[in-house]
Amino acid sequence: MPNITVTSLLAMKQKGEKITMLTCYDATFAHTASQAGVEVLLIGDSLGMVLQGHDSTLPVTTAETAYHVACVKRGNQGAMILADLPFMANATLEQTFINSATLMQAGAHMIKVEGAAWLGESIRLLAERGIPVCAHMGLTPQAVNVLGGYKVQGRLEAQARQMRADAIALEQAGAAMILLECVPSELAEEITQAVKIPVIGIGAGSATDGQVLVLHDMLGLSISGRVPKFVKNFMTGQPDIQSAIRAYVAAVKDVSFPATEHGFSA
């Protein structure tokens, strides 16, 4: 697979080719996933839950994320490396820049930040200094205590209207990509059509420009036993992990995943 860049992802959206993304935290899985055709490897703060055993993503630090970014970089075979900016790592503009630079120096190609229109100044700062940014909207796990739990966002018309406006504002601020988590499928489709940059979904229906899942979820691995509605176990019927990942890539590309049952209504 040729090296995936911001330009590559934009071209895929323009051609209508679906983008595949998986979380990844080490060199072996980075090699396996990128060889299987995954375009974007996300070093998510989900590592706090699936690797460290926490009940939320909040305890994860920038240093821990940078460590896993460096691990992924060593095994990667051409995929884009997207790194989460952890909880409170962007509390000020100075912190945003310093922590983002740390992750880029560790090997990331793009930084993901959680929030809404208030991220505009931070995104503009980073984009102007050569750091591509993915804006994570909808259900933002770092704000779980404010949101009252892991709930679908944007079901109320006022919320949906605000989310559409925020997406456009963040694109104008310089965001290179948007990730929508747990929003009604119809709203996700509207946002995808409203912006020129790629929109990746998780629990956001099939009309987005691509999909992302937590690696452990799509392999059927879970400590709690609770499986989110938007997850499919791609390990079922497959002889090995790389085959399962290839099945995920194929299903996203031919739009057989996500199916209607993996999404949410307004």
UniProtKB/Swiss-Prot annotation:
GO biological process: pantothenate biosynthetic process
Residues that hold 3-methyl-2-oxobutanoate according to the record: 45-46, 84, 112
Gene: panB
Protein's recorded name: 3-methyl-2-oxobutanoate hydroxymethyltransferase
Active site: 181 (proton acceptor)
Cofactor binding notes: Binds 1 Mg(2+) ion per subunit.
Pfam families noted in UniProt: Pantoate_transf (PF02548)
Subunit structure, as described in the record: Homodecamer; pentamer of dimers.
Known cofactor(s): Mg(2+)
Example of a GO MF term: magnesium ion binding
Presence of the UniProt keyword Magnesium in the record: yes
Lineage: Bacteria, Pseudomonadati, Pseudomonadota, Gammaproteobacteria, Pseudomonadales
Coiled-coil annotated spans: none
Family (UniProt): Belongs to the PanB family.
One Gene Ontology cellular component: cytoplasm
Chief localization: cytoplasm
Reaction equations catalysed: 3-methyl-2-oxobutanoate + (6R)-5,10-methylene-5,6,7,8-tetrahydrofolate + H2O = 2-dehydropantoate + (6S)-5,6,7,8-tetrahydrofolate
Disulfides per UniProt: none
Keyword field: Cytoplasm, Magnesium, Metal-binding, Pantothenate biosynthesis, Transferase
E.C. designation(s): 2.1.2.11
Function statement: Catalyzes the reversible reaction in which hydroxymethyl group from 5,10-methylenetetrahydrofolate is transferred onto alpha-ketoisovalerate to form ketopantoate.
Subcellular location: Cytoplasm
Superkingdom, taxonomy of origin: Bacteria
Sites where the protein binds Mg(2+): 45, 84, 114
Pathway: Cofactor biosynthesis; (R)-pantothenate biosynthesis; (R)-pantoate from 3-methyl-2-oxobutanoate: step 1/2
